[in-house]
């Protein structure tokens, strides 16, 4: 899935890649701060472990984005000197991992609301750590196998049965994760805003809902474009290439937006000066706001 097509070196290629680099640099700083604070400055709990790994996935995805776009711009200036390597497989690992983290966050939060007694009493202590480790391993395995059999969007082996099976399995995984994300998020919304036993809105709910919403608006188009190009065989002409560039910019915006969401939710309605640690801590707060509310982490089980 190379970003270049014959004769495509023009302002339409230059501007999107500059946007990717700019938003990517902002996102790298934001996700690095989130990773540092959650990894070394704050006590970890069930949901902060997922947020930490999501920040790592966003950081790696943006890093690949920046390298890819920078090399493309250098090739734009010196087409005969610099070879543009393919980062598609590497980029898909954090993309799949990020989607998996979001699905896991939303699903676990849904379970804590729908089955609160089971969640508090029967949930294994290290569930978040085990889940995140499994997500990284499976994401890497899926991408390596897909690249081994045919490569992402590589039409060279498109009629090979192993390639078709690998692409089908990868697409099925993405669709499954998307369905899980949507259903669990919908269940959370129903419990928050509908029925007599609706839950009170907390900052943790707001953080999760905004993160999922931004992914659906900005991160999902990249996966949809990949799916259409693989299975429906859309013509990779000017129109499809423009959509592809737009999807790439949106994915960079998605990974860049997550730290902004955390700090926005954590600082909302608090005018006084606070450290980034306190703001991020408040964004993961799982208790309803009160006039005398103090900063506290989620009441979920703490994980080492």
From Swiss-Prot:
Tissue: Expressed in a subset of IB4-positive small diameter nociceptive dorsal root neurons.
Topological relation to the membrane, as annotated: Multi-pass membrane protein
UniProt keyword list: Cell membrane, G-protein coupled receptor, Membrane, Receptor, Transducer, Transmembrane, Transmembrane helix
Chief place of localization: membrane
Lineage top rank: taxon: Eukaryota
CC per GO annotation: plasma membrane
Extracellular compartment spans: 1-17, 68-80, 154-167, 233-244
GO BP terms, alphabetized: G protein-coupled receptor signaling pathway
Cytoplasmic face of the membrane: 39-46, 102-132, 189-211, 266-304
One Gene Ontology molecular-function label: G protein-coupled receptor activity
Transmembrane segments: 18-38, 47-67, 81-101, 133-153, 168-188, 212-232, 245-265
Family: Belongs to the G-protein coupled receptor 1 family. Mas subfamily.
Compartmental location: Cell membrane
Name under which the protein is recorded: Mas-related G-protein coupled receptor member A
UniProt cross-references to InterPro entries, sorted A to Z: GPCR_Rhodpsn, GPCR_Rhodpsn_7TM, MRGPCRA, MRGPCRFAMILY
Function: Orphan receptor activated by a subset of RFamide-family neuropeptides such as FLRF-amide and FMRF-amide. Mediates its action by association with G proteins that activate a phosphatidylinositol-calcium second messenger system. Its effect is mediated by G(q) and G(11) proteins. May regulate the function of nociceptive neurons by modulation of pain perception.
């Amino acid at each position: 899935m190379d970003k270049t097509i014959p004769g495509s070196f023009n302002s339409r290629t230059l501007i999107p890649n500059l946007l990717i680099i700019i938003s990517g640099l902002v996102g790298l700083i934001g996700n690095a701060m989130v990773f540092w604070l959650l990894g070394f400055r704050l006590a970890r709990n069930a949901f902060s472990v997922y947020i930490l790994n999501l920040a790592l996935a966003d950081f790696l995805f943006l890093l690949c984005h920046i390298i890819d776009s920078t090399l493309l711009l250098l090739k734009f200036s010196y087409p005969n000197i610099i070879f543009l390597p393919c980062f598609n497989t590497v980029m898909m690992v954090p993309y799949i991992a990020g989607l998996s983290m979001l699905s896991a966050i939303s699903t676990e939060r849904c379970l804590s609301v729908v089955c609160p007694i089971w969640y508090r009493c029967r949930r294994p202590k290290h569930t978040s750590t085990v889940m995140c480790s499994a997500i990284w391993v499976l994401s890497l395995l899926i991408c390596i196998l897909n690249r081994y059999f045919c490569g992402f969007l590589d039409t060279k082996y498109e009629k090979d049965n192993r390639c078709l099976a690998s692409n089908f399995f990868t697409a099925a995984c993405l669709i499954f994760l998307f369905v899980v994300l949507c259903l669990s998020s919908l269940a959370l919304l129903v419990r928050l805003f509908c029925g007599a036993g609706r839950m009170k809105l907390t900052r943790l709910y707001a953080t999760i809902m905004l993160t999922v919403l931004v992914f659906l608006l900005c991160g999902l188009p990249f996966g949809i474009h990949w799916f259409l190009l693989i299975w429906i065989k859309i013509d990779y002409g000017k129109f499809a290439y423009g959509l592809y560039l737009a999807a790439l910019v949106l994915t960079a915006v998605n990974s860049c937006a997550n730290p902004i969401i955390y700090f926005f939710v954590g600082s909302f309605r608090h005018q006084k000066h606070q450290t980034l640690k306190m703001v991020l801590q408040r964004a993961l707060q799982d208790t309803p706001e009160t006039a005398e509310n103090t900063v506290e982490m989620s009441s979920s089980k703490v994980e080492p």
